[in-house]
Amino acid sequence: MIHTSKHAANIVAVRPGVERLTAINSKTFKDEVVALIEDGASHLIIDFSEVSFLDSSGLGALTGVLKRIGHRGDLVVSGLNGDVTQMFKICRMDRVFKSYPDVGAAVQAMSENL
């Protein structure tokens, strides 16, 4: 389901691989990202540039991943479109997750903080 790309300093960008992250696929998404963390990934960028819709289950999966990574690393989001941004704001997730316009900006910011 997910697609990954590795960047410098153990930074991994993750694309969910779906247009809609919902109750139907959020558990699979979470399980696959948690497996990356268990394999040693500690700085993750979730790239939502291809995701047009996100429901509460998708947000729940994302917060579950954040809880799993804990203080061992960092989790940020990038590429949020208007609807996904609105969902983040309504649920106040914009206060929880750092957001960047694209993966490149997220990689640069994370690299500077390592």
Where are these predicted regions, by residue range?
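Residues that form or immediately flank small-molecule/cofactor binding pockets and catalytic motifs
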Residues: 9, 82, 104
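STAS-typified acidic loop motif
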Residues: 3-31
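Non-catalytic signal-transmission and effector/linker regions of two-component phosphorelay proteins
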Residues: 1-7, 111-114
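A charged, well-structured terminal subsegment
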Residues: 98-114
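Generic signature of intrinsically disordered, low-complexity, basic-rich segments
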Residues: 4, 53, 101-105
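Amphipathic alpha-helical interaction surfaces in cytosolic regulatory modules
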Residues: 20-97
